[in-house]
């Protein structure tokens, strides 16, 4: 799940105090008191929250800090293969037992039951489950329990799934995917991101030995890399007791393999890639500058919160500049933009991009680079900043009125980001007061300075 642009969302942040007399940017962010969290002796982290939007429903997630990057060459594609196998038999739900057990309660595969595998994580979910049946809630907990540690991985089920994933491998070969496959060796040069695309190697998928997938499973599907997140209309104290009783029984792996962090090497020269595909009709150009992510130790401070607001202001004002260009007669490109955002775990990026008119790649590139350079040299104007400040405050007031209508999945997204990337989880009342205090302190010089920080000659990649 990479994100290219950081947008300030209005469902983040917490504390039940009144307005601050003064903003202390080094103050720690208090965790949302509405979330019950803990860590079991075997290492499993759990997050629980009562929520009645929608009433009488709950969502159950298991979040695993393990994905395709952890594969060796013989396992290329097996993190995703394992995701499929989680629906093909577990200790308490043989065969298609998970799906048949839930579908009789109206909880269907695809709509309510799903999963995804990414380079750094694998996530399973049972969403929008009715809470009027205690036995159904217990069934959902038992499914998460089995997904944690008790996949059966039977030979015949593995062989049956090879064909399913082979077909998925073929359908994923879209023009955009083929372009990405050409770009990744440059975008992620000399890193494991360049060689792990999640769907994997077709030869591996068709021919891997049964023990190969079991080895990957036993090495990385383990309690110290897992979190349980459950949000919905239920008694939290009762749910916590059930989680403790059921999940504490899962054994921790002895002498676990350290979970590595995958770096992307720094470089001084610009890397360049020309990616082509006969089915792609438009020419797009990107210049990506890799930037370090914020250390986890700095994310739990108001200063991190303020930084994200400044970054959001920059992106909004840059976007407004591009919108003005597009509204003029005969704009120099089909579309374009530049801005800051997340890249992959541990990294951010500044991205300049444009889609050119036919045979006008030079015109499009010159136009987008000229506007980017104008911001780098001269910054933004006070009036531009005031507009985005006003827009954010208007949006904040609107979001505050709707804060009690936040859905289960939105809360779980925050829990997932906290577990995987140590993003803070704060209550909206705190967020509301903090934003109103921080926004007036942000100057146009602070926002404009970002352009010089992000437009560097190091760690640049250009794709066309």
Segment roles from a protein language model:
Residues 6-17:
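Bacterial N-terminal signal peptides
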